Protein backbone atom coordinates (compact mmCIF):
# COMPACT_ATOMS: atom_id res chain seq x y z
CA UNK A 1 0.00 0.00 0.00
CA UNK A 2 2.96 2.33 0.45
CA UNK A 3 3.54 2.21 -3.31
CA UNK A 4 -0.05 3.36 -3.83
CA UNK A 5 0.50 6.09 -1.25
CA UNK A 6 3.53 7.34 -3.16
CA UNK A 7 1.49 7.28 -6.38
CA UNK A 8 -1.35 9.37 -4.94
CA UNK A 9 1.15 11.84 -3.45
CA UNK A 10 2.73 12.26 -6.89
CA UNK A 11 -0.75 12.68 -8.36
CA UNK A 12 -1.52 15.39 -5.81
CA UNK A 13 1.64 17.23 -6.81
CA UNK A 14 0.65 16.86 -10.45
CA UNK A 15 -2.27 19.23 -9.78
CA UNK A 16 0.13 22.07 -10.57
CA UNK A 17 1.13 21.06 -14.13
CA UNK A 18 -2.43 19.80 -14.78
CA UNK A 19 -3.71 23.33 -14.29
CA UNK A 20 -1.29 24.69 -16.88
CA UNK A 21 -1.94 22.39 -19.84
CA UNK A 22 -4.85 21.99 -22.25
CA UNK A 23 -8.03 21.17 -20.33
CA UNK A 24 -9.17 18.34 -22.62
CA UNK A 25 -5.83 16.56 -22.39
CA UNK A 26 -5.58 17.17 -18.66
CA UNK A 27 -9.07 15.77 -18.05
CA UNK A 28 -8.18 12.53 -19.80
CA UNK A 29 -4.87 12.21 -17.96
CA UNK A 30 -6.46 12.84 -14.57
CA UNK A 31 -9.23 10.35 -15.28
CA UNK A 32 -6.77 7.65 -16.31
CA UNK A 33 -4.47 8.27 -13.33
CA UNK A 34 -7.37 8.34 -10.86
CA UNK A 35 -8.73 5.06 -12.23
CA UNK A 36 -5.30 3.44 -11.97
CA UNK A 37 -4.92 4.62 -8.38
CA UNK A 38 -8.37 3.31 -7.48
CA UNK A 39 -7.63 -0.12 -8.92
CA UNK A 40 -4.25 -0.31 -7.20
CA UNK A 41 -5.61 0.76 -3.80
CA UNK A 42 -8.52 -1.68 -3.81
CA UNK A 43 -6.19 -4.50 -4.86
CA UNK A 44 -3.70 -3.72 -2.07
CA UNK A 45 -6.29 -3.52 0.72
CA UNK A 46 -6.45 -6.30 3.29
CA UNK A 47 -9.87 -7.89 3.98
CA UNK A 48 -10.29 -6.07 7.29
CA UNK A 49 -9.40 -2.73 5.74
CA UNK A 50 -11.81 -3.28 2.86
CA UNK A 51 -14.66 -3.93 5.30
CA UNK A 52 -13.79 -0.77 7.23
CA UNK A 53 -13.64 1.25 4.01
CA UNK A 54 -17.12 0.09 3.01
CA UNK A 55 -18.44 1.08 6.43
CA UNK A 56 -17.08 4.62 6.51
CA UNK A 57 -17.17 5.58 2.84
CA UNK A 58 -20.05 3.56 1.40
CA UNK A 59 -22.96 5.90 2.29
CA UNK A 60 -21.07 9.02 1.19
CA UNK A 61 -20.11 7.51 -2.14
CA UNK A 62 -23.66 6.30 -2.75
CA UNK A 63 -24.88 9.88 -2.32
CA UNK A 64 -22.07 11.18 -4.53
CA UNK A 65 -23.22 8.96 -7.40
CA UNK A 66 -26.50 10.89 -7.68
CA UNK A 67 -24.95 13.85 -9.58
CA UNK A 68 -23.22 11.39 -11.91
CA UNK A 69 -26.53 9.70 -12.68
CA UNK A 70 -28.13 13.10 -13.27
CA UNK A 71 -25.41 14.07 -15.76
CA UNK A 72 -25.97 10.79 -17.61
CA UNK A 73 -29.71 11.47 -17.65
CA UNK A 74 -29.04 14.94 -19.06
CA UNK A 75 -27.19 13.39 -21.99
CA UNK A 76 -29.88 10.85 -22.91
CA UNK A 77 -32.08 11.64 -25.96
CA UNK A 78 -35.30 12.27 -24.02
CA UNK A 79 -37.46 14.42 -26.27
CA UNK A 80 -40.10 15.16 -23.60
CA UNK A 81 -37.40 16.74 -21.35
CA UNK A 82 -35.23 18.17 -24.13
CA UNK A 83 -33.92 21.71 -23.93
CA UNK A 84 -35.97 24.09 -26.15
CA UNK A 85 -32.81 24.89 -28.12
CA UNK A 86 -33.13 21.52 -29.88
CA UNK A 87 -36.64 22.39 -31.08
CA UNK A 88 -35.44 25.71 -32.46
CA UNK A 89 -32.49 24.01 -34.17
CA UNK A 90 -34.82 21.45 -35.74
CA UNK A 91 -37.11 24.17 -37.05
CA UNK A 92 -34.12 26.00 -38.51
CA UNK A 93 -32.82 22.88 -40.24
CA UNK A 94 -36.28 21.79 -41.34
CA UNK A 95 -35.93 18.39 -39.70
CA UNK A 96 -36.89 17.17 -36.21
CA UNK A 97 -33.98 16.58 -33.83
CA UNK A 98 -33.92 14.09 -30.97
CA UNK A 99 -32.71 16.45 -28.28
CA UNK A 100 -31.62 16.07 -24.69
CA UNK A 101 -31.49 18.19 -21.55
CA UNK A 102 -27.90 19.19 -22.24
CA UNK A 103 -27.10 21.54 -25.09
CA UNK A 104 -23.52 20.27 -25.35
CA UNK A 105 -23.06 16.53 -24.89
CA UNK A 106 -19.29 16.76 -25.17
CA UNK A 107 -19.03 19.29 -22.36
CA UNK A 108 -21.35 17.22 -20.17
CA UNK A 109 -19.30 14.10 -20.84
CA UNK A 110 -16.15 15.94 -19.77
CA UNK A 111 -17.85 17.04 -16.55
CA UNK A 112 -18.95 13.46 -15.88
CA UNK A 113 -15.36 12.28 -16.28
CA UNK A 114 -14.18 14.94 -13.83
CA UNK A 115 -16.80 13.92 -11.27
CA UNK A 116 -15.92 10.24 -11.56
CA UNK A 117 -12.23 11.17 -11.24
CA UNK A 118 -13.05 13.01 -8.03
CA UNK A 119 -14.86 9.97 -6.64
CA UNK A 120 -11.95 7.73 -7.62
CA UNK A 121 -9.50 9.95 -5.76
CA UNK A 122 -11.81 10.03 -2.73
CA UNK A 123 -11.93 6.22 -2.56
CA UNK A 124 -8.19 5.89 -3.15
CA UNK A 125 -7.34 8.47 -0.48
CA UNK A 126 -9.75 6.85 1.98
CA UNK A 127 -8.17 3.45 1.40
CA UNK A 128 -4.71 4.90 1.96
CA UNK A 129 -5.70 6.97 5.00
CA UNK A 130 -6.97 3.99 6.98
CA UNK A 131 -3.41 3.95 8.31
CA UNK A 132 -2.65 7.23 10.12
CA UNK A 133 0.98 7.30 8.95
CA UNK A 134 -0.10 7.11 5.32
CA UNK A 135 -2.76 9.76 5.96
CA UNK A 136 -0.08 12.08 7.33
CA UNK A 137 2.01 11.57 4.19
CA UNK A 138 -0.98 12.48 2.00
CA UNK A 139 -1.72 15.56 4.13
CA UNK A 140 1.86 16.81 3.83
CA UNK A 141 1.71 16.35 0.06
CA UNK A 142 -1.49 18.41 -0.06
CA UNK A 143 0.06 21.15 2.08
CA UNK A 144 3.14 21.36 -0.15
CA UNK A 145 1.04 21.41 -3.33
CA UNK A 146 -1.26 24.15 -2.06
CA UNK A 147 1.76 26.25 -1.07
CA UNK A 148 3.09 25.96 -4.63
CA UNK A 149 -0.34 26.92 -5.97
CA UNK A 150 -0.34 29.94 -3.65
CA UNK A 151 2.93 31.12 -5.18
CA UNK A 152 1.36 30.88 -8.65
CA UNK A 153 -1.64 32.91 -7.47
CA UNK A 154 0.59 35.66 -6.11
CA UNK A 155 2.60 35.85 -9.32
CA UNK A 156 -0.63 35.89 -11.37
CA UNK A 157 -2.42 38.57 -9.36
CA UNK A 158 -3.25 41.89 -10.99
CA UNK A 159 -0.83 44.05 -8.93
CA UNK A 160 2.13 41.74 -9.58
CA UNK A 161 1.28 41.42 -13.27
CA UNK A 162 1.06 45.21 -13.53
CA UNK A 163 4.40 45.60 -11.74
CA UNK A 164 5.98 43.13 -14.14
CA UNK A 165 4.39 44.88 -17.11
CA UNK A 166 2.42 41.77 -18.17
CA UNK A 167 -1.28 41.45 -18.91
CA UNK A 168 -3.33 39.35 -16.52
CA UNK A 169 -4.48 36.27 -18.45
CA UNK A 170 -6.30 34.61 -15.53
CA UNK A 171 -5.01 31.14 -16.41
CA UNK A 172 -4.26 30.69 -12.70
CA UNK A 173 -7.94 30.88 -11.72
CA UNK A 174 -8.14 27.14 -11.19
CA UNK A 175 -5.38 27.23 -8.58
CA UNK A 176 -7.59 29.35 -6.34
CA UNK A 177 -9.65 26.23 -5.62
CA UNK A 178 -6.47 24.35 -4.67
CA UNK A 179 -5.42 27.09 -2.26
CA UNK A 180 -8.89 27.35 -0.71
CA UNK A 181 -8.69 23.64 0.05
CA UNK A 182 -5.20 23.93 1.51
CA UNK A 183 -5.86 26.61 4.12
CA UNK A 184 -8.15 24.61 6.46
CA UNK A 185 -6.13 21.43 6.03
CA UNK A 186 -2.79 23.02 6.92
CA UNK A 187 -4.32 24.87 9.88
CA UNK A 188 -6.02 21.76 11.25
CA UNK A 189 -2.85 19.71 10.96
CA UNK A 190 -0.88 22.48 12.68
CA UNK A 191 -3.31 22.46 15.61
CA UNK A 192 -3.37 18.66 15.91
CA UNK A 193 -0.73 18.05 18.54
CA UNK A 194 -1.18 14.28 18.60
CA UNK A 195 -1.64 13.52 14.94
CA UNK A 196 1.97 13.31 13.79
CA UNK A 197 3.20 10.45 15.96
CA UNK A 198 5.41 8.46 13.64
CA UNK A 199 8.69 8.44 15.52
CA UNK A 200 9.52 12.15 15.22
CA UNK A 201 11.06 13.99 18.15
CA UNK A 202 9.26 16.82 19.92
CA UNK A 203 11.47 19.36 18.15
CA UNK A 204 10.69 17.85 14.76
CA UNK A 205 6.96 17.89 15.51
CA UNK A 206 7.12 21.52 16.59
CA UNK A 207 9.01 22.45 13.43
CA UNK A 208 6.48 20.59 11.24
CA UNK A 209 3.53 22.25 12.95
CA UNK A 210 5.20 25.63 12.52
CA UNK A 211 5.67 25.00 8.81
CA UNK A 212 2.04 23.94 8.45
CA UNK A 213 0.83 27.06 10.27
CA UNK A 214 3.04 29.27 8.11
CA UNK A 215 1.77 27.49 5.01
CA UNK A 216 -1.85 28.05 6.05
CA UNK A 217 -1.17 31.76 6.59
CA UNK A 218 0.65 32.11 3.28
CA UNK A 219 -2.13 30.34 1.39
CA UNK A 220 -4.78 32.50 3.07
CA UNK A 221 -2.95 35.72 2.18
CA UNK A 222 -2.41 34.56 -1.39
CA UNK A 223 -6.05 33.55 -1.88
CA UNK A 224 -7.35 36.81 -0.41
CA UNK A 225 -4.89 38.83 -2.52
CA UNK A 226 -6.07 37.07 -5.67
CA UNK A 227 -9.75 36.41 -4.93
CA UNK A 228 -10.43 39.54 -2.88
CA UNK A 229 -13.53 39.70 -0.70
CA UNK A 230 -15.14 36.53 -2.04
CA UNK A 231 -12.14 34.39 -1.14
CA UNK A 232 -11.69 36.12 2.22
CA UNK A 233 -15.26 35.34 3.29
CA UNK A 234 -14.94 31.67 2.36
CA UNK A 235 -11.55 31.27 4.06
CA UNK A 236 -12.73 33.02 7.22
CA UNK A 237 -15.60 30.56 7.56
CA UNK A 238 -13.35 27.53 7.10
CA UNK A 239 -10.76 28.82 9.55
CA UNK A 240 -13.49 29.62 12.09
CA UNK A 241 -14.83 26.07 11.90
CA UNK A 242 -11.37 24.56 12.45
CA UNK A 243 -10.66 26.87 15.39
CA UNK A 244 -14.08 26.22 16.90
CA UNK A 245 -13.57 22.46 16.66
CA UNK A 246 -10.13 22.78 18.25
CA UNK A 247 -11.50 24.97 21.07
CA UNK A 248 -14.40 22.60 21.75
CA UNK A 249 -11.99 19.70 22.09
CA UNK A 250 -9.50 21.68 24.18
CA UNK A 251 -12.17 22.94 26.57
CA UNK A 252 -13.95 19.56 26.65
CA UNK A 253 -17.26 21.15 25.76
CA UNK A 254 -20.32 18.95 25.50
CA UNK A 255 -21.32 18.13 21.94
CA UNK A 256 -24.59 20.02 22.32
CA UNK A 257 -22.72 23.10 23.53
CA UNK A 258 -20.53 22.86 20.45
CA UNK A 259 -23.61 22.52 18.25
CA UNK A 260 -25.22 25.56 19.87
CA UNK A 261 -22.09 27.64 19.35
CA UNK A 262 -21.89 26.56 15.72
CA UNK A 263 -25.57 27.40 15.18
CA UNK A 264 -25.10 30.85 16.74
CA UNK A 265 -22.11 31.61 14.51
CA UNK A 266 -24.03 30.39 11.47
CA UNK A 267 -27.03 32.62 12.28
CA UNK A 268 -24.81 35.67 12.77
CA UNK A 269 -23.04 34.98 9.48
CA UNK A 270 -26.38 34.47 7.70
CA UNK A 271 -27.82 37.70 9.08
CA UNK A 272 -24.71 39.61 8.01
CA UNK A 273 -24.84 38.11 4.52
CA UNK A 274 -28.54 38.91 4.07
CA UNK A 275 -27.98 42.49 5.19
CA UNK A 276 -25.24 42.96 2.57
CA UNK A 277 -26.76 41.11 -0.37
CA UNK A 278 -27.72 42.53 -3.76
CA UNK A 279 -31.47 43.27 -3.77
CA UNK A 280 -33.85 42.03 -6.44
CA UNK A 281 -31.59 39.32 -7.87
CA UNK A 282 -31.48 35.55 -7.49
CA UNK A 283 -30.04 34.18 -4.24
CA UNK A 284 -27.25 32.45 -6.17
CA UNK A 285 -25.75 35.84 -7.14
CA UNK A 286 -26.94 37.99 -4.24
CA UNK A 287 -23.65 37.96 -2.32
CA UNK A 288 -21.04 38.41 -5.04
CA UNK A 289 -18.80 41.44 -5.44
CA UNK A 290 -19.01 41.80 -9.23
CA UNK A 291 -19.82 44.50 -11.82
CA UNK A 292 -23.50 45.34 -12.05
CA UNK A 293 -23.75 44.35 -15.72
CA UNK A 294 -22.36 40.88 -14.98
CA UNK A 295 -24.78 40.41 -12.08
CA UNK A 296 -27.73 41.53 -14.21
CA UNK A 297 -26.80 39.36 -17.19
CA UNK A 298 -26.43 36.35 -14.90
CA UNK A 299 -29.82 37.13 -13.37
CA UNK A 300 -31.35 37.21 -16.86
CA UNK A 301 -29.67 33.92 -17.75
CA UNK A 302 -31.07 32.18 -14.66
CA UNK A 303 -34.55 33.58 -15.28
CA UNK A 304 -34.67 32.16 -18.81
CA UNK A 305 -33.34 28.69 -18.02
CA UNK A 306 -35.47 25.53 -18.08
CA UNK A 307 -36.06 23.94 -14.69
CA UNK A 308 -33.81 20.96 -15.44
CA UNK A 309 -30.82 23.07 -16.43
CA UNK A 310 -28.97 23.10 -19.71
CA UNK A 311 -26.41 20.39 -19.09
CA UNK A 312 -23.28 19.96 -17.01
CA UNK A 313 -20.33 21.97 -18.28
CA UNK A 314 -22.34 24.17 -20.64
CA UNK A 315 -22.01 27.55 -18.92
CA UNK A 316 -19.77 29.07 -21.59
CA UNK A 317 -22.17 28.01 -24.35
CA UNK A 318 -25.11 29.53 -22.51
CA UNK A 319 -23.29 32.74 -21.67
CA UNK A 320 -22.54 33.41 -25.33
CA UNK A 321 -26.22 34.33 -25.68
CA UNK A 322 -26.11 36.84 -22.86
CA UNK A 323 -22.55 38.16 -22.81
CA UNK A 324 -20.70 39.93 -25.60
CA UNK A 325 -17.39 38.06 -25.42
CA UNK A 326 -15.16 38.17 -28.49
CA UNK A 327 -13.41 34.85 -29.12
CA UNK A 328 -12.11 32.45 -26.48
CA UNK A 329 -11.71 33.91 -23.01
CA UNK A 330 -10.92 32.82 -19.48
CA UNK A 331 -12.89 35.68 -17.94
CA UNK A 332 -15.89 34.67 -15.79
CA UNK A 333 -19.02 34.32 -17.87
CA UNK A 334 -21.41 34.17 -14.90
CA UNK A 335 -21.23 36.09 -11.65
CA UNK A 336 -20.89 33.11 -9.29
CA UNK A 337 -20.19 29.41 -9.29
CA UNK A 338 -23.63 28.89 -7.77
CA UNK A 339 -25.24 30.50 -10.80
CA UNK A 340 -23.14 28.33 -13.09
CA UNK A 341 -24.18 25.16 -11.26
CA UNK A 342 -27.86 26.12 -11.36
CA UNK A 343 -27.53 26.84 -15.08
CA UNK A 344 -26.01 23.41 -15.63
CA UNK A 345 -27.86 21.12 -13.22
CA UNK A 346 -31.10 22.94 -12.53
CA UNK A 347 -32.23 24.65 -9.35
CA UNK A 348 -33.63 21.54 -7.63
CA UNK A 349 -30.44 19.51 -8.05
CA UNK A 350 -28.26 22.44 -6.97
CA UNK A 351 -30.12 23.04 -3.71
CA UNK A 352 -30.18 19.30 -3.07
CA UNK A 353 -26.39 19.28 -3.40
CA UNK A 354 -26.19 22.24 -1.00
CA UNK A 355 -28.29 20.35 1.56
CA UNK A 356 -26.17 17.21 1.19
CA UNK A 357 -23.00 19.29 1.60
CA UNK A 358 -24.35 20.77 4.84
CA UNK A 359 -25.08 17.26 6.12
CA UNK A 360 -21.53 16.27 5.19
CA UNK A 361 -20.11 19.26 7.07
CA UNK A 362 -22.09 18.28 10.16
CA UNK A 363 -21.01 14.63 9.93
CA UNK A 364 -17.33 15.49 9.58
CA UNK A 365 -17.54 18.03 12.42
CA UNK A 366 -19.14 15.48 14.74
CA UNK A 367 -16.48 12.97 13.77
CA UNK A 368 -13.72 15.48 14.56
CA UNK A 369 -15.36 16.34 17.88
CA UNK A 370 -15.62 12.70 18.96
CA UNK A 371 -12.28 11.55 17.58
CA UNK A 372 -9.22 11.06 19.76
CA UNK A 373 -6.01 11.40 17.82
CA UNK A 374 -6.07 12.45 14.18
CA UNK A 375 -9.16 14.62 14.64
CA UNK A 376 -7.65 17.10 12.17
CA UNK A 377 -8.56 15.02 9.11
CA UNK A 378 -12.37 15.12 9.52
CA UNK A 379 -12.10 18.70 10.82
CA UNK A 380 -10.22 19.70 7.67
CA UNK A 381 -12.77 17.93 5.47
CA UNK A 382 -15.64 19.76 7.19
CA UNK A 383 -13.89 23.12 6.91
CA UNK A 384 -12.99 22.57 3.26
CA UNK A 385 -16.60 21.74 2.40
CA UNK A 386 -17.79 24.86 4.24
CA UNK A 387 -15.16 27.00 2.51
CA UNK A 388 -16.13 25.78 -0.94
CA UNK A 389 -19.85 26.00 -0.13
CA UNK A 390 -19.49 29.71 0.59
CA UNK A 391 -17.08 30.21 -2.29
CA UNK A 392 -19.69 29.11 -4.83
CA UNK A 393 -21.83 32.08 -3.72
CA UNK A 394 -19.01 34.64 -3.57
CA UNK A 395 -16.63 33.73 -6.41
CA UNK A 396 -17.12 33.39 -10.19
CA UNK A 397 -17.07 30.02 -11.89
CA UNK A 398 -13.52 28.69 -11.65
CA UNK A 399 -11.88 25.80 -13.54
CA UNK A 400 -12.49 22.68 -11.46
CA UNK A 401 -9.72 20.53 -12.90
CA UNK A 402 -6.70 21.60 -10.78
CA UNK A 403 -8.68 21.18 -7.56
CA UNK A 404 -10.19 17.76 -8.27
CA UNK A 405 -7.25 15.71 -6.99
CA UNK A 406 -6.56 17.83 -3.90
CA UNK A 407 -10.23 18.06 -2.91
CA UNK A 408 -10.72 14.32 -3.35
CA UNK A 409 -7.67 13.59 -1.20
CA UNK A 410 -8.91 15.81 1.64
CA UNK A 411 -12.40 14.30 1.64
CA UNK A 412 -11.01 10.76 1.40
CA UNK A 413 -8.67 11.18 4.36
CA UNK A 414 -11.51 12.75 6.33
CA UNK A 415 -13.79 9.80 5.63
CA UNK A 416 -11.18 7.24 6.67
CA UNK A 417 -10.27 9.04 9.90
CA UNK A 418 -13.76 10.21 10.92
CA UNK A 419 -14.25 7.04 12.97
CA UNK A 420 -11.46 4.98 14.50
CA UNK A 421 -11.31 1.32 13.52
CA UNK A 422 -11.26 0.20 17.16
CA UNK A 423 -14.39 2.21 17.94
CA UNK A 424 -16.19 0.81 14.90
CA UNK A 425 -15.38 -2.75 15.96
CA UNK A 426 -16.50 -2.01 19.52
CA UNK A 427 -19.77 -0.49 18.26
Label for each model-derived stretch:
Residues 6-20, 38-120, 218-221:
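N-terminal hydrophobic segments of proteins, predominantly signal-anchor/transmembrane helices
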Residues 24, 73-85, 155-163, 274-286:
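Helix-to-loop transition at the C-terminal end of transmembrane segments
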Residues 23-41, 56-58, 306, 406:
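Loop-to-helix transition at the N-terminal end of transmembrane alpha-helices
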Residues 74, 295-331, 335, 346-349:
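TM-adjacent membrane-interface loops and short helices in multi-pass inner/ER membrane proteins
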Residues 59-60, 82-94, 286, 290-305:
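Extracytoplasmic loop-helix module adjacent to an early transmembrane segment
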Residues 3-17, 34-39, 109-278, 318-324, ...:
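Alpha-helical transmembrane segments of multi-pass inner-membrane proteins
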Amino acid sequence: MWNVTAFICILIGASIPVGLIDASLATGLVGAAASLGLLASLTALRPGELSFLRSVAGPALAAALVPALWIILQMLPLSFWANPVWKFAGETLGAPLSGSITIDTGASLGTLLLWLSLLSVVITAAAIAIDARRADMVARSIAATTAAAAVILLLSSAPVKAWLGAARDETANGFLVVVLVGVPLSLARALDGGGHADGRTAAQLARLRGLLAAGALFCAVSACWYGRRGAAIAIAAGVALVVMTFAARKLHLHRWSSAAAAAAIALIALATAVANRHPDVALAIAFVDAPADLVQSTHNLLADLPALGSGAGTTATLAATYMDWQGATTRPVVATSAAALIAQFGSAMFWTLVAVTIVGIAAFTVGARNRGRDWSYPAAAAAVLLTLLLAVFTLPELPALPGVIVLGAVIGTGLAQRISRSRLRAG
